[in-house]
């Protein structure tokens, strides 16, 4: 339920109105674009940005008829098209994913700072365990134990606060559904349960 989401819990505690702009399957490129588009039109007192998996990407699909709600082709595990499979199998690299993450983080940070909008960042990326089928590894079988943020660097990290780690949802919740954390639903696509959202909200409130 919406009232149990961490965004609602934080807003209720602060006695503020809020708008949850989350969108399933959106890439960090899309999060950057939507954030700027909204902030250019509406007054914002505070922004909590949750970055998604760094392997999610998007490209402008010029063949898609306009106007359309989203002329962007989403490149993620939820899109099983041939082009997406080819991208993950032959083009995607951890170096490029990390560079793109830090680029988007820097641009959102720069924009919000220029607009004098206070912000707090979270992210969803986590250490990949051997054999886990997630995005790239759905189509490319060379999975291995990997901590992307520790092992891959980007020139974008020189800018802004990019050398400071972004708090990860899975760290806040003490792991993920596979490691036995009690803060997730038991569905095929696990998400934080009510207790998990409460824990995330408490973490954000401590950071404000």
Task: Go through the PLM ranges and name each one.
Residues 1-30, 36, 40-41, 192, ...:
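Serine-esterase "nucleophile elbow" of acetyl-processing enzymes
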Residues 36-208:
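Alpha-helical cap/lid subdomain in secreted, periplasmic
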């Amino acid at each position: 339920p919406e009232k149990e989401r961490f965004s609602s819990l934080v807003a209720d505690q602060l006695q503020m109105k809020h708008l949850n702009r989350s969108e399933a399957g959106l890439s960090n490129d899309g999060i950057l674009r939507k954030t700027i588009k909204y902030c250019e039109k509406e007054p914002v007192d505070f922004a909590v940005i949750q970055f998604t998996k760094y392997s999610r990407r998007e490209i402008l699909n010029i063949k898609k008829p306009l106007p359309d709600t989203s002329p962007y082709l989403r490149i993620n595990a939820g899109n099983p098209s041939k082009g997406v499979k080819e991208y993950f199998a032959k083009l995607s690299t951890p170096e490029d994913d990390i560079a793109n993450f830090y680029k988007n983080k820097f641009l959102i940070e720069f924009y919000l700072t220029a607009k004098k909008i206070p912000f707090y960042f979270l992210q969803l990326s986590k250490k990949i365990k051997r054999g886990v089928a997630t995005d790239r590894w759905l189509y490319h079988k060379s999975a291995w134990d990997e901590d992307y943020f520790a092992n891959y660097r980007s020139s974008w990290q020189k800018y802004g606060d990019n050398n400071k780690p972004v708090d990860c949802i899975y760290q806040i919740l003490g792991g993920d559904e596979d490691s036995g954390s009690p803060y997730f639903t038991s569905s095929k696509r696990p998400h934080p349960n009510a207790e998990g959202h409460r824990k995330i909200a408490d973490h954000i409130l401590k950071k404000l």
